[in-house]
Each structure stands twice: as structure tokens, then as C-alpha cells.
Amino acid sequence: MFKGLFICSLIAVICANALPQPEASADEDMDEREVRGIGKFLHSAGKFGKAFVGEIMKSKRDAEAVGPEAFADEDLDEREVRGIGKFLHSAKKFGKAFVGEIMNSKRDAEAVGPEAFADEDLDEREVRGIGKFLHSAKKFGKAFVGEIMNSKRDAEAVGPEAFADEDLDEREVRGIGKFLHSAKKFGKAFVGEIMNSKRDAEAVGPEAFADEDFDEREVRGIGKFLHSAKKFGKAFVGEIMNSKRDAEAVGPEAFADEDLDEREVRGIGKFLHSAKKFGKAFVGEIMNSKRDAEAVDDRRWVE
């Protein structure tokens, strides 16, 4: 359990410390303001990630938390709900800051491009916002994998002691790369569903967000996100923990060299779980923003 905690904490520390430097983004032609925005995002992500790990991993049921059965009926007990609630509260706060930093930027109309979301009927402003998020995620993923795979940079990025107990070999590095690559593809796929939906008003239910004053349309969008995230989470955890299903979902060659043990599975599962919850709050904040009046051209969004 403690090693699983170490893995999650390591990810949080890397999120907080590895990327904020302007020079890390030099090749991306980013201005100072954008670099500061990404730096603030990663710093906040590190803080709330640590808090979430602390709340969830202190419980006695960690070993079963990420098993396939944990996602079956979402039968979370009161203690788990309290931990998730605290996490979502933190996620909401840093989500607001992230939206402010990224959505107010002057650039990145080409980061994804309107044509990438043509079928979703998104206007240019929405595409820029989504593009910024995906672009940042892509850069973060590349840099994170780079830090792990290049031992010469470890001392500057995190410190050699952070990796001492883990002793990651090439096999483990490939596993981290696969996870980040899958997460990026998943994010791109479900963005369209969130932003251009006509259904799922019952997926979460208006009452779940009553205090946030979400209208029906916002609830539908959030419902789609949660539905997609739940399916993704089930499949990902199931594939990692059950080697018998690998051949159908990805192909045995994808995981053949990984040979993940139980400790690694718990760490990956916890990271995925926190990412899912952060995404839930982040999308909620984007869709409940005062700036959305222009983005979706709907008077119901105007105060």
C-alpha cells in the first residue's frame, strides 16, 4: 500500500515540479503568459493530487479499491464518498484557475484547428479552448515520459532520491508511456460527446449539481463525460488487472513486455481514478463559465 502511495505521490510531485520552467516549452513557441498558465496548472495539480491520495489511500480497503469489482456498481461507502468530495472541492478550485489561464489566451487557434471538431459544430473559440487543453496535456505527457526515460535529467527534475526505491526499468517506462498515450486518445474522443450532446439528462441528474445552479443542458454534458469516463476506467483497470482480456481489447503484444505486478496495478489505478475525478470537475467548470455565453451562443447562459 505504501509503495502504491509512493507511486501516486511521485506522479503528483512530477506534475508540480517538472514542467513549469519557461525553457521546457521553448520549442512550442509559447509566450511568458502561457508558460505561467501551464506552470500554475501543474502546481495546482500537484497539490490537489497529493490531497486526494492522502484522503483515499488512508483507508483500509486500498487493495480492493482499483479491482474490476470496485467499478461494477460504484457502491462507495461513506468514507470513500467523503474523500472524493474533498478531492472534487479542490479540483473545482484549481479547475477555475486553469480555465482562467488557458481560455483567456490569445493563441492556439491552430493547436487543434476548427476542422478537428467540424462534426461537433463547435465554434472557433471553443476549439481554441479545447485545443489548449489537449496541447498542454500532450506536452506534459511528452515531458513526463522524457524525465522518466532519461536518467541524466532526473537529478534536476525531481532528484535522484525520488526514484531510488522504485528503480524503474525500461519495461516500466513503456508502461507509463502507454498509459499517457491512452489517456490522450481517450480525452480527444470524449470531448466531442461532452460539448455537442442531446441526451443523458438522467446520467447524473440535476439534483446532483443543485447547489451549482447547473441547467439541464450542462447536466447532460456532464452526464456524458461521466458515462464515458466510467466506461474508460472500467476497461483500463480491467485490462491491466486481467491478462485474459488483453487479447480482445488491445492485443497481447501491447502488454506482453509489461508484466505488471499488483503494486504497479494499484498505483496506475489510483492515478487513473484521480484523473477521472479531476476531469469531471474541470469539465463542469468550463461548461458553467460566464464566458460560455459567447462560446455556445445561447442566451440561457447569460446572467
Curated annotation (Swiss-Prot):
Signal peptide location: 1-18
Any GO BP annotation: killing of cells of another organism
Any single GO CC term annotated in Swiss-Prot or TrEMBL for this entry: extraorganismal space
Tissues expressing this chain: Synthesized in the stomach and stored in a novel granular multinucleated cell in the gastric mucosa. It is stored as active, processed peptides in large granules within the granular gland secretions of the skin.
Listed transmembrane segments: none
Keywords, alphabetical: Amphibian defense peptide, Antibiotic, Antimicrobial, Antiviral protein, Cleavage on pair of basic residues, Cytolysis, Fungicide, Hemolysis, Immunity, Innate immunity, Repeat, Secreted, Signal
Subcellular location: Secreted
Propeptide: 19-26, 33-36, 62-72, 79-82, 108-118, 125-128, 154-164, 171-174, 200-210, 217-220, 246-256, 263-266, 292-303
Repeat among keywords: yes
Main subcellular location of this protein, as a coarse class: secreted
Family (UniProt): Belongs to the gastrin/cholecystokinin family. Magainin subfamily.
Role, per record: Antimicrobial peptides that inhibit the growth of numerous species of bacteria and fungi and induce osmotic lysis of protozoa. Rapidly inactivates channel catfish herpesvirus (ED(50)=48 uM) over a wide temperature range. Magainins are membrane lytic agents.
Stated name of the protein: Magainins
Organism (species): Xenopus laevis
